[in-house]
């Protein structure tokens, strides 16, 4: 496979700008429907959870390549350059959740943010996490992301509150296991 594409221009391009009232964005993508079957290198100002719904893809972050299969996922910290592409002849559908940091706490001067979240997100080695079902705490996080997906597929009034709940729960597990 030719990886020259990963050395091409790296840009910031949000999927959609988040509004001042939106705390998250969900986007379901099919790698085969993307230009050149590639999610070009980029970064986002929000946290991202990526969950593979079906198939397999190659995911790159911090000069590392990962094969990600159905039922697996990633967490990306803000500002992490990442990309994805098809792997061999596999199809791949995946969901991306872009999460505003304000989902966790409205302001960065919040004592809980300062105590639990800031040390994680500001740590230079905390750029990303992989989630695989073989690891119990990661399996639990993957289940929460699946629940978020189910809720977004059939939203009812207040569904955003459930999403916020799951995001806080995910960060609780990340904090205790990283």
Features from the language model and the residues they span:
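Generic protein-terminus/edge-of-domain signal
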Residues: 1-67, 73, 80, 114-115, ...
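A hydrophobic/aromatic-rich effector-binding and dimerization subdomain
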Residues: 2-24, 85-149
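Short histidine-centered beta-strand/loop micro-motifs
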Residues: 37-44, 85-87, 107-109, 159
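A conserved hydrophobic position in a structured secondary element of the catalytic/binding core
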Residues: 76-77, 99
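Residue-level recognition of conserved beta-strand edge/terminus positions
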Residues: 77-79, 85
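An amphipathic alpha-helical interaction segment
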Residues: 132-178
